[in-house]
Amino acid sequence: MVKSRNTTTAHVHDVPRIMGGIKKLKLTKETAMAAGRKLKTLLAKVDAVEKVCVICMEPTYTKKTLAECDIEGGALRVTTMPCPTHYICDNCIRQEMEDKCPICRKDWPERRIIYGNEAKLYKYWLIDNDDIMILENNNDIDELTPEEEDHLLSDDESDNYVPRYTLDSLVEEVLSERSQMSNDRLMNDMIDNIAVNNAIDDDCIIIDDYIDLTI
């Protein structure tokens, strides 16, 4: 992981787990891209770096932010390294069969968010090119049985989902957390429960990532 000063680095690994209620939301590519640009501008500025994959040893030189987002199946996703210690290129990541770093054997981080004053879990699944399915649990965090999962996935009319953040309020909270934490904590702790819900007219964008506030 690049430890540049005033850097916010996002790590994501796709480990979906089923949580409580469900809701389908429409998302336009333009809305997602606009929100992604704003998030990157405010939270993820890094200098150009050369990174070498620890598996294939091929170098990658890039000027893009480590929290670069792209559009995949209608969802805005962060596409950076899931291991905070060892850089592995996208090609090698795709060939990994386990949810662990092949070097240090640490589990890939889960994706989580913070909303309000409590840390709770959100997960999303991509449904098709335009839809996102939100899986939410407002109470205790429990994994569902396969039978419960099948029932939940058929319940398209659930009203359990309520957006918790605008893009601006997420930025405000992240920067507030950053200013309150000591340098040592910033180097070692993850503010891991972060996502963005930004409603624009009838569109809602979801950004779900794992953010390491490193200075």
Curated annotation (Swiss-Prot):
Q: One GO molecular function term? A: zinc ion binding
Q: What are the record keywords, sorted? A: Metal-binding, Zinc, Zinc-finger
Question: Zinc-finger: present as a keyword of the record?
Answer: yes
UniProt KW Metal-binding keyword: yes
Query: Zinc finger (RING-type) residue ranges?
Result: 53-105
On the tree of life, the source organism's domain of life is Viruses
Cited InterPro entries: Znf_RING, Znf_RING/FYVE/PHD
Q: What is this protein called?
A: Putative zinc finger protein ORF121
Query: From which organism does this entry originate?
Result: Ostreid herpesvirus 1 (isolate France) (OsHV-1)
